[in-house]
From Swiss-Prot:
<protein>
    <recommendedName>
        <fullName>Co-chaperonin GroES</fullName>
    </recommendedName>
</protein>
<comment type="function">
    <text>Together with the chaperonin GroEL, plays an essential role in assisting protein folding. The GroEL-GroES system forms a nano-cage that allows encapsulation of the non-native substrate proteins and provides a physical environment optimized to promote and accelerate protein folding. GroES binds to the apical surface of the GroEL ring, thereby capping the opening of the GroEL channel.</text>
</comment>
<keyword id="KW-0963">Cytoplasm</keyword>
<comment type="similarity">
    <text>Belongs to the GroES chaperonin family.</text>
</comment>
<dbReference type="InterPro" id="IPR011032">
    <property type="entry name" value="GroES-like_sf"/>
</dbReference>
<comment type="subunit">
    <text>Heptamer of 7 subunits arranged in a ring. Interacts with the chaperonin GroEL.</text>
</comment>
<dbReference type="InterPro" id="IPR037124">
    <property type="entry name" value="Chaperonin_GroES_sf"/>
</dbReference>
<dbReference type="InterPro" id="IPR020818">
    <property type="entry name" value="Chaperonin_GroES"/>
</dbReference>
<dbReference type="InterPro" id="IPR018369">
    <property type="entry name" value="Chaprnonin_Cpn10_CS"/>
</dbReference>
<dbReference type="GO" id="GO:0046872">
    <property type="term" value="F:metal ion binding"/>
</dbReference>
<dbReference type="GO" id="GO:0051085">
    <property type="term" value="P:chaperone cofactor-dependent protein refolding"/>
</dbReference>
<dbReference type="GO" id="GO:0044183">
    <property type="term" value="F:protein folding chaperone"/>
</dbReference>
<dbReference type="GO" id="GO:0051087">
    <property type="term" value="F:protein-folding chaperone binding"/>
</dbReference>
<keyword id="KW-0143">Chaperone</keyword>
<dbReference type="GO" id="GO:0051082">
    <property type="term" value="F:unfolded protein binding"/>
</dbReference>
<dbReference type="GO" id="GO:0005737">
    <property type="term" value="C:cytoplasm"/>
</dbReference>
<dbReference type="Pfam" id="PF00166">
    <property type="entry name" value="Cpn10"/>
</dbReference>
Length: 103
């Protein structure tokens, strides 16, 4: 299988999906202990890098997505599809899996 190159800036999610760059997980505890990868929790916060056009309604119109590119969001722990591109971690979420925006 040939590897393909995807430019994140040209990626456009479909429907009400949101593409999020995952924030880095904590490298050490509050007490200063370094955590191995196996002990790190999956981050649940990230920055929106692309947004779909919104969910299509029965009449054919679209419901706008409530978040925009650049928003920091908190999302469900087991939500979405994890994607790794150019060494960075991303998650493709449905809008309903986003719990809150972070100021």
């Amino acid at each position: 299988m040939a590897a393909i190159s995807i430019n994140v800036s040209t990626l456009k999610p479909l429907g009400d999906r949101v593409f999020v760059k995952v924030s880095e997980s904590e490298e050490k505890t509050a007490g200063g202990i370094l955590l191995p990868d196996s002990a790190k929790e999956k981050p649940q916060i990230g920055e929106v890098v692309a947004v779909g056009e919104g969910k299509r309604n029965d009449d054919g119109s679209r419901s706008a997505v409530d978040v925009k590119v650049g928003d920091k969001v908190l999302y469900s722990k087991y939500a979405g599809t994890d994607i790794k591109l150019s060494g960075d971690d991303y998650v493709l979420l449905s809008e309903k899996d986003i719990l809150a925006t972070v100021a």
